């Protein structure tokens, strides 16, 4: 991202930014503490960055606590349908909680902490002391989570790796950070994270350290966990999928392509009646969470 401080601002721009800063602080207070501004008087906007990559081209706001210098971030993005449904499905079906706000066409997302995927593969993966088996296991589970709920484009720039020291080993959790390809593409391969070339190093780890039976075991574990989460949040999930079914998420040609691919993959006619991406997503969840995992 490029920083707004990299160029000398004009006096007019300075006045606009000064006027904008308290509003940005208020948004942070709404996102994090429910809008109680009395608890946000010591917060300030330290920096505004502009994302020059990706479809969302977000603004990243850095909020700093004047008492202790601690900083946090949030993002301002365009609230398109795929991204909103992706956030909801991530919150409901994954082990991760998501915090965001929507107002009209504006989406406010909290920062998801972790090492960017490309940085993790470049700087952490070559470390001989790292537990490659645990990494391979987590990437299998991550890929399965994305595929089951049809979240696509999980290239290395679109996820982070959360590294947590445990009492004996280190735990790894892979988390998506961009959800604009939720149930959007017509090519089924886009939803299979391990097929992207920049994920090849971790896919090689999977093939090196996990046999087919173990891969199926980890995928079945993820199926069970997602099924349990879906049951706990059944009302919310039903509401999201109902709205998704009424929304034009993707072009018609994408719908037809994905529908044909799913029919071919599972040999099931249940997908043929689906007229929206929302219906395809709901049917895929229903079908797969009650099926023995198919081989990769």
Where are these regions (language model features)?
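Short, surface-exposed, polar/charged, turn-prone segments marking secondary-structure boundaries
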Residues: 102-105, 127-128, 136-138, 202-207
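Short C-terminal domain-edge/linker segments immediately following a structured domain
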Residues: 92-94, 105-110, 142, 204-213
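AlphaC helix of the protein kinase catalytic domain
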Residues: 119-126
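Conserved ATP-binding subdomain of kinase catalytic cores across diverse folds
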Residues: 8-118
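Conserved kinase catalytic-core segment
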Residues: 127-189
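C-terminal catalytic region of ATP-dependent kinase domains
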Residues: 168-296
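Short secondary-structure transition/capping segments
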Residues: 10-18, 84, 145-155, 201-205, ...
């Amino acid at each position: 991202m490029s920083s707004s401080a990299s160029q000398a601002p004009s006096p007019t721009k300075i006045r606009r930014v000064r006027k904008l800063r308290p509003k940005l602080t208020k948004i942070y207070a709404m996102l994090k503490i429910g809008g109680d501004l009395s608890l946000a008087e010591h917060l300030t906007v330290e920096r505004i960055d502009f994302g020059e990559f990706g479809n969302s081209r977000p603004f990243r706001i850095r909020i700093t606590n004047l008492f202790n210098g601690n900083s946090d971030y949030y993002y301002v993005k365009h609230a398109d349908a795929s991204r909103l449904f992706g956030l909801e499905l991530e919150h409901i079906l994954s082990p991760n909680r998501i915090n965001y706000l929507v107002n009209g066409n504006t989406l406010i997302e909290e920062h998801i902490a972790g090492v960017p995927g490309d940085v993790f593969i470049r700087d952490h993966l070559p470390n001989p002391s790292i537990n490659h088996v645990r990494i391979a296991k987590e990437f299998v589970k991550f890929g399965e989570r994305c595929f089951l709920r049809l979240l696509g484009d999980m290239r290395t720039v679109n996820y982070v790796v959360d590294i947590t020291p445990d009492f004996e080993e280190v735990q790894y959790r892979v988390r998506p950070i961009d959800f604009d390809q939720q149930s959007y593409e017509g090519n089924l391969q886009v939803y299979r994270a391990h097929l992207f070339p920049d994920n090849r190093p971790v896919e090689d780890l999977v093939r090196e350290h996990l046999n087919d039976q173990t891969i199926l075991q980890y995928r079945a574990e993820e199926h069970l966990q997602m099924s349990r989460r879906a049951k706990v949040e059944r009302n919310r999930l039903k509401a999201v999928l109902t709205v998704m079914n009424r929304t034009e998420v993707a072009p018609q040609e994408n719908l037809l392509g994905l529908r044909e691919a799913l029919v071919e993959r599972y040999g099931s006619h249940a997908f043929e009646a689906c007229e929206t991406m929302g219906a395809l997503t709901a049917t895929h969840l229903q079908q797969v969470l009650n099926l023995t995992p198919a081989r990769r």
